[in-house]
């Protein structure tokens, strides 16, 4: 057997590491989602200390190695560190390493041949201490790659991710591992920033504030929860001991942007086949981004400041309505200005070497101001000739803040405040705590809207002769409620304790969420001017006849004051506790075993719980094996369960309050400013036909009793190999299976059958509202059959007649990586995957439905027929490659490649004629079934959208004569390949063929060029 030192020297030569050996044994490590660790081994423990010092802030930690030479330093802020081995007051070895968020950095030392010689080492690219899957990107790496400055573009660099449907999150809501776009968790400095109302997308920060972005695609430990998709974990920059200022300006000019494709009617046998549907080729888009930052020490080594502000302005001119819209002649052209102002302020206080406070303030404020003008397609639209004939008189528009045009399509910002504490109580005990809050305001103001002015309706036959009826409120219908908001208060506490070969980590977190959401009648209500045929008859059971008030009432004239509102103030309480043990079973095998216990409680606007899910245990087990004992070959595996909460917005539709009241008056005149009636005399009090006076629904009638949450099981097996200093490669297999889901169903038939069988009065004619339930399982309900009393109803899965939810994701990932060496870095990922089932999850990309967790998928059993197949987020093949090359100190280039097979196609039509039996409620749904022209059309069996092929490139120049200046050009979609991303899948309109069936909804963005000038100055 070789001596240890001889073996290590041989490995050093083999791997090209001239000074620092890779660990022969690996100490137990447990990572935090807001920091990283350094661990390793020294040759001689006696009389040795290991000093870890941040090169930029001076933060200093000292560790005493164990008898076997192992050491670890936990809960370190991300950044660059010097690790020094001290003996007899002198440095005998050292290494300079990077600490990444949520990861361990192995820094081990062998006996130096001359102990007084200081040696600088290089860390391994493989983290043996981690069992999760994903990728971490530093600010330096992101600056080199040609990507747009959004979190969504970082996510797409990672394997097992794809872009979600373009109708979600303004096209920036990703899918991880076949999950829905609402099933991800986003964190900034440990604080959850996911959109709490719909869970689609998240608040962001100035892109230049990102120090590191960790994208976890699976296998995450017990500390992470509330995700069955992926986790995005961002750490922000901090100030250092050197003052630094800088900024950048970038522009994507419309003159360097290629024209987007027109959209034409598909060829499906309709008279419109091949004709122009949406004219796009004269659409214009430009974007300008300005970013300024400052950072430095308030007190050297103690107190630091980093502040960053960013403004993004996007100007668009485009058609917004298609050629089949009669409204296009007035509002078919849009001029739009989107502005997003973002800011971050970070304060770091190193109280001493063992205690640290971090305060973070983030502001993300997206706004959109849209003006609508006329667009005349005219006869030219039929021939396909350029039909551009826009008007210049503004006839419509809208203003949005964190909203619109639909709730799930919006980018949603927030104002966020976070306070983090880290206490290294000893070498073996670390305590971390976090408290924070976020606030979001949603605003929607249509063009010409007059707050507080009621809408009016009348006809010539209902108007009093001689009076002038005016329209005071130009906006009709319902609007987002005034003062809509989301608030979130968060706290977490974590304790890590090392004892022997075990590092035990435990903690808890609590999220309290409150929202005001829903819609109400624009202006507050409607004045409906009416005339009774017989003025002497009462208008209703609780209303008098118009003639009883005399005057115009004797001729039957009266007005109805209508108030309609679906506004609710729902709230959610989310809590979790976890414990995890990282056990170094042998010198080469690490086992992480943990369990997470989740509790979700959703309340209606009256603070009554309508769903409460407790004791949801999620076991997690991860194993890593350092096969060669030198960190050059890692085999790993994971198995675990993951739960997901329901979004807050479910309460608005399913459990929210409903207000629909009427009150009758006679009147004598019309206000010429508002159109409201004057001279009112009551004919009735406030009435409501269905007793809708703004009270919430009985929470017991909203959802099945004792529901289980949506949860998923996952298995991951893989390996990573550091083959040489120039090559890492690996493979990974992932399997995910959805075990339970929550959706609503609206079928009265099971309740009718139960009531008839149990002799309940009125059961045969019972009309059910929608219930939340677990599809494919037995469910218990509380039902009012019309008596005002609730009846317990137990329905088996067979009686409900729904299949069990099914969603599986199986993937094989292969990667090869050239670490940053000899001036270049590159990585290639290939994924072969299959995403199959009868539900996408909480969203429904088939139609872009906006009702997260209350989709139409399980409304009726007939909707599930033929629904098992390839799901919308399935991409059978994906090849991702990115990297950069530094030609000289002044010139570098970068590239980013995506090659992906297209999304599966569906034909979703009417039920066949045989289902149109009397009383079948499913026939009311129209084109929502997996039948095409009366024939079964199983999900995902009609081919795919075209292959997506995108190449992005950049070039950067840093002139030596102006230190700190960087000039860069990025070209996105350099080949200008525009392919369909999704299509209209509804086959029928009424009983006929939908002329838009097969129509492209969105294409790949056309080629564009971004020019950037950046300047950084260090004092």
State each model region's role.
Residues 28-120:
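Periplasm-facing N-terminal accessory domains of Gram-negative outer-membrane beta-barrel systems
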Residues 302-305, 354-357, 428-431, 501-504, ...:
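Repeated loop/turn-to-beta-strand initiation elements of outer-membrane beta-barrel proteins
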Residues 66, 89-106, 118-238, 275-278, ...:
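Periplasmic N-terminal accessory/gating domains of Gram-negative outer-membrane beta-barrel systems
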